[in-house]
Amino acid sequence: GLMSVLKKAGKHVAKNVAVSLMDSLKCKISGGC
């Protein structure tokens, strides 16, 4: 149903946000921004 679609989309978005946050953290830590 719609709820499962929304949950899947939410997980996908959350994963992308987490990945980009990790990338920016690594960038700041390594000083390569």
From Swiss-Prot:
Major localization class: secreted
Disulphide bond pairs: C27-C33
Pfam families for this protein: Antimicrobial_2
BP GO terms, sorted: defense response to bacterium
Expression sites (tissue/organ): Expressed by the skin glands.
Location of this chain's protein in the cell: Secreted
Entry GO terms, CC: extracellular region
Sorted UniProt keywords: Amphibian defense peptide, Antibiotic, Antimicrobial, Disulfide bond, Secreted
Xref: InterPro entries: Antimicrobial_frog_2 (IPR012521)
Stated family: Belongs to the frog skin active peptide (FSAP) family. Brevinin subfamily.
Function of the molecule: Has antibacterial activity.
Protein name as it appears in the record: Brevinin 2AV
